[in-house]
Amino acid sequence: MSGIGNKRAAGEPGTSMPPEKKAAVEDSGTTVETIKLGGVSSTEELDIRTLQTKNRKLAEMLDQRQAIEDELREHIEKLERRQATDDASLLIVNRYWSQFDENIRIILKRYDLEQGLGDLLTERKALVVPEPEPDSDSNQERKDDRERGEGQEPAFSFLATLASSSSEEMESQLQERVESSRRAVSQIVTVYDKLQEKVELLSRKLNSGDNLIVEEAVQELNSFLAQENMRLQELTDLLQEKHRTMSQEFSKLQSKVETAESRVSVLESMIDDLQWDIDKIRKREQRLNRHLAEVLERVNSKGYKVYGAGSSLYGGTITINARKFEEMNAELEENKELAQNRLCELEKLRQDFEEVTTQNEKLKVELRSAVEQVVKETPEYRCMQSQFSVLYNESLQLKAHLDEARTLLHGTRGTHQHQVELIERDEVSLHKKLRTEVIQLEDTLAQVRKEYEMLRIEFEQTLAANEQAGPINREMRHLISSLQNHNHQLKGEVLRYKRKLREAQSDLNKTRLRSGSALLQSQSSTEDPKDEPAELKPDSEDLSSQSSASKASQEDANEIKSKRDEEERERERREKEREREREREKEKEREREKQKLKESEKERDSAKDKEKGKHDDGRKKEAEIIKQLKIELKKAQESQKEMKLLLDMYRSAPKEQRDKVQLMAAEKKSKAELEDLRQRLKDLEDKEKKENKKMADEDALRKIRAVEEQIEYLQKKLAMAKQEEEALLSEMDVTGQAFEDMQEQNIRLMQQLREKDDANFKLMSERIKSNQIHKLLKEEKEELADQVLTLKTQVDAQLQVVRKLEEKEHLLQSNIGTGEKELGLRTQALEMNKRKAMEAAQLADDLKAQLELAQKKLHDFQDEIVENSVTKEKDMFNFKRAQEDISRLRRKLETTKKPDNVPKCDEILMEEIKDYKARLTCPCCNMRKKDAVLTKCFHVFCFECVKTRYDTRQRKCPKCNAAFGANDFHRIYIG
C-alpha cells in the first residue's frame, strides 16, 4: 500500500490520462479477474480478503506503471538532450548569423558614404540571442520576477518568434532574414565597387599632368579622407560604447551564470540524494510487496482459520500462530513509528540545515558588506588611520620643503649664473672701455705731439718776432718780478694771518666748549674788530710798498738793464726747480693715492672680517676715518694753494716760457698718465687671469668686488683727472688770452707811462688783488666753517645710529635669550612626549599581547563549546535511541505480560484499513480523496484544494512550501 505515494517524473506531461486497461476496469466494474479467497467465516473477513487482493493487484499495476514511467523518463531525457543540442546549435547559428549581420552593418557604416545608419537599422532584424525562458512559476523568485516584468515591453527575439510561429511562418521569416543578409552583402559589393571606381578616378586625376586637375583631385581626396576620418571616429565611438555595454552585460551574465552554476550543482546534489532515497524506498517497497504477495498467495491458495492461540489451514498442513502474527504487526507498527521518528528527525535536520545554510549565506553577504565597516571600527584601524594621516601630513610638509628647497636651489643657480654672466659682461665692457681709452689717449698723444710741433714752430717764429721787443719785455719782466716779490711778501703775511686765525679758532672752540653760547657771542663780537685791523695792515703796508717801489723804480732804472739777464736766468732755473718740485709732488700724490687705495682695501677687508665685532671698534674706526679725512682736506687745501701760486707764477711769467712750460708739463703729464694707465692695464689683466682661475671661491668673488670697486674708483679718478686737466687747459687758455691782453695793456701802459706814473697804477692793481685775495680767504674760511658744521652733524647722526644699533642689539639679545628659554622648554616637553609615546607603545604592545592571549582563550573556549555541543547532540541522539529502545522493550514486555489482551486479526485489519483511508484522504480538507499530485515535490492532495490554492495565488506546497506553477500539478487515479 505504500506504493501509492510513488512520484511521477518531471518530464511527464501533466494532463496525461491513465492507461486504457485501467479505465476499462473502472468503467466496467465486472471484468475482474476471479480470485480464490478460501474459507470465509464472515463478511468482514471477506472485505479484508478482497482488500488484500485489491492491494496486491494495485501493487502489480504500480510496478508496471513504474516500469513504464522509467521507460518514458529515459525517452524524455533523450528528447531533452536532443532538444538541448538542437537549441544549442540553433543558438550558435543565430549568434554567428547575427554577428555576420552586425559585421556587415559595421562594414557598410565604414565604407558607405551615402547611406546613413538609420536606413540600415530599419532593414535589419533584431538578432539578439534569447535568454532561455524560465519555467513558468517554478519558484517564488521566478514568479516575483515575472510579476515585476509584466509592466515592461516584451523583447521578442528571432528565435522566440520562430518558436511561437507555425512552419509556414517560420519558412517565410527565415526567407526574409536570408534576403536581408543577401541585400546587405550586395550593398557591400556595390559600396566596394563605388570605392574602387572613386579610387581609380582619383588616381587617374593625380597621374594626369594638368596641375588644375591634380589640385582638384587633391582637394577631393582631402575632403574624402576628412569625411572618412569623421566616419571612422563615429564608428570607433559607437563600437567603444557597444563594447562597454557588452562588457557590462557580460560581467552581469557571468555573475548570474556563476550563481546559477552553484545553484545547479546544489540542486543536482540534492536530486542525487533524493533519487538515491527514492530508489532505496522503492526497492524496499518492492521487496515488501513481493513478500506480502507471496504470503497472501499462500494464505489464499490453502485457506486458514484462526483459533485463539493458534490456527490451522483447511486442506493444508500450515499453521499460523496468532500471537506471532500480532507480534509481527506490533513490530511493523514499531518500525513505522521508528520510521516516522526518523523522518521527523530527518525533517528537523533538513530544516536545521536549511536554516544554517540561509544563515551562512546571510553571514556571507553581511561579511562582504560589513567587513569594511567592522575593520574601520576597530581601534587598530583607527590607530593606523591616525598614523597614516600624521605621516601623510608630514610627507606633504616634507614635499613642500623639498619644493621650496628646489626652487631656492634653482633660484640661486639662476642668480649665480646671471651674476657670473653680468661679471663677464662687465669685464668685457671694461676691457673694451680700457682699450678705447688707451686708443683715445694714444690719439690725443699724437695730436698733442702735432700741436707741440706746431707750437714749437710758432714759438720760434714768435722768438724771432719778439727779439725786436726785447728791451720792452725786459722792463716789463723786471716790473713783474718786483710785483711777484711783493706778492710773495703779501702771501707770507696772509699765511701768518691764517695761522693766527686758526689759533684764534682753536681758542674760540675751547672757550665755546667751556663757557657756552654767551661766550660764543662775545667771541664773535671780538673777532670783528680783529679782522678790521687785519685788513688795514695790508693797506698801510701796500702804501709803504708802493712808495718804496716808486723810489726803487726811480733809483734803479739804470741797474735794471744789467740785472735783467741775471733775473731771466734765475727765473729759468727757478721754473725748472718748480717743475721738478711739481713732478715730485705729483709722484708723491700718486704714492699717497696708492697708499690710500691700499689702506681702503685693507679697511674693507678688515671691515668684512670684523663685521661681527663690537661697536666700540666701529666708533674708533669712524674717528680715525674722520681724522684721515681732515688730513686729506688739509692736504687738498695746501695743494690748492700751491696750484694757485703756480697759476699766479704762470700768469706772471712771459708767454713764450709759459707756453713752453705748459707744453712740457702737459707732455710729461700725459706720458706719466699713459704709463700709469698701461701699468694699471697690465695689473688688471694679471688680476683678471688670477680671478678667472679662482672664480668659484668666495675669496675670488670678494676680490672681484674689490677690483670692481677699485676699477670704479680709478674710473672716477681718471674722470676727475680729465676734468682737472681740462680745467687746467681752460685756465691755461684763459691765462694765455689774459697774457695777450696784458701785453696789449702793457703796450698801452708803456704809452701811458710817458704820461702818467706807472708806480701808482701798479700799487692800485696790487691793492685790488690783495683785496680779492682777502675776500677769497674769507670765503674759504666760511666754507671751512660750513664743512666743520656738516662734519659735526654727520658725527652726531652717526652717534645716533650707533645708539639705535646698540638698542637693537640689546633687544635682539633679549629675544635670543627668550627664544633659548622657549627652546629649552619645548625640548623638555618633546622629551616628555617621547617618553609618554614610548610608554603608550609599551602599553599597546602589552595590550596586544593580552588581546592575543584572550583571543586564543576565546578560540579555545569556542572549540570546547563546539565539542561540548557535538557531544551533547550525540548524547541526545543516544538518549533518544535509548528511549526508543526502552519504549520498544516495554511494549514487548507488555505483550509478553498480557497475552490475553491481544486484539483479534479483524481489529488489526480494520485499523489498517482506517489508516489507509486516512492516508488516501486529502490532508488539507480531510474530506475528499487524493486525486492530484505536485510534480515539483510529488506530494498528493485533492484536485480542488490544489486548484483553489493556485487560483488564490498561494502557489506553495502545504507540506514542503515548494513553489509550483500551472504545469506543475495534474490528476492521478487511484483504484
From Swiss-Prot:
Mapped zinc finger ranges (RING-type): 922-961
Pathway entry: Protein modification; protein ubiquitination
Gene Ontology BP term (one): positive regulation of transcription by RNA polymerase II
E.C. code: 2.3.2.27
Biased composition (Low complexity): 543-552
Residue numbers spanned by region Disordered: 1-30, 125-155, 507-622
GO MF annotations in UniProt: chromatin binding; histone binding; histone H2B C-terminal K residue ubiquitin ligase activity; identical protein binding; mRNA 3'-UTR binding; p53 binding; transcription coactivator activity; ubiquitin protein ligase activity
Residue runs in coiled coils: 43-90, 168-375, 429-898
GO annotation, cellular component aspect: HULC complex; nucleolus; nucleoplasm; nucleus; ubiquitin ligase complex
Alphabetic keyword roster: Acetylation, Chromatin regulator, Coiled coil, Host-virus interaction, Metal-binding, Nucleus, Phosphoprotein, Transferase, Ubl conjugation pathway, Zinc, Zinc-finger
Cellular localisation: Nucleus
UniProt catalytic activity: S-ubiquitinyl-[E2 ubiquitin-conjugating enzyme]-L-cysteine + [acceptor protein]-L-lysine = [E2 ubiquitin-conjugating enzyme]-L-cysteine + N(6)-ubiquitinyl-[acceptor protein]-L-lysine
Classification via InterPro entries: E3_ubiquit_lig_Bre1, Znf_C3HC4_RING-type, Znf_RING, Znf_RING/FYVE/PHD, Znf_RING_CS
Modified residues (N6-acetyllysine): 21, 348, 510
Gene3D superfamilies: 1.20.1170.10, Zinc/RING finger domain, C3HC4 (zinc finger)
Tissue: Expressed in the normal brain and also in malignant gliomas (at protein level).
SUPFAM superfamilies on file: RING/U-box (SSF57850)
Chain intervals with Basic and acidic residues compositional bias: 139-151, 527-540, 558-622
Chief location category: nucleus
Residues recorded as bearing Phosphoserine in the entry: 41, 136, 138, 522, 562
Assembly behavior: Component of the RNF20/40 complex (also known as BRE1 complex) probably composed of 2 copies of RNF20/BRE1A and 2 copies of RNF40/BRE1B. Interacts with UBE2E1/UBCH6. Interacts with p53/TP53 and WAC. Interacts with PAF1; the interaction mediates the association of the PAF1 and RNF20/40 complexes which is a prerequsite for recruitment of UBE2A/B. Interacts with isoform 1 and isoform 2 of PA2G4. Interacts with FBXL19. (Microbial infection) Interacts with human herpesvirus 8 (KSHV) protein RTA/ORF50; this interaction targets the SMC5-SMC6 complex for proteasomal degradation.
Entry function: Component of the RNF20/40 E3 ubiquitin-protein ligase complex that mediates monoubiquitination of 'Lys-120' of histone H2B (H2BK120ub1). H2BK120ub1 gives a specific tag for epigenetic transcriptional activation and is also prerequisite for histone H3 'Lys-4' and 'Lys-79' methylation (H3K4me and H3K79me, respectively). It thereby plays a central role inb histone code and gene regulation. The RNF20/40 complex forms a H2B ubiquitin ligase complex in cooperation with the E2 enzyme UBE2A or UBE2B; reports about the cooperation with UBE2E1/UBCH are contradictory.
PANTHER family per UniProt: E3 UBIQUITIN-PROTEIN LIGASE BRE1A, RING FINGER PROTEIN-RELATED
Protein name per Swiss-Prot or TrEMBL: E3 ubiquitin-protein ligase BRE1A
Record organism: Homo sapiens (Human)
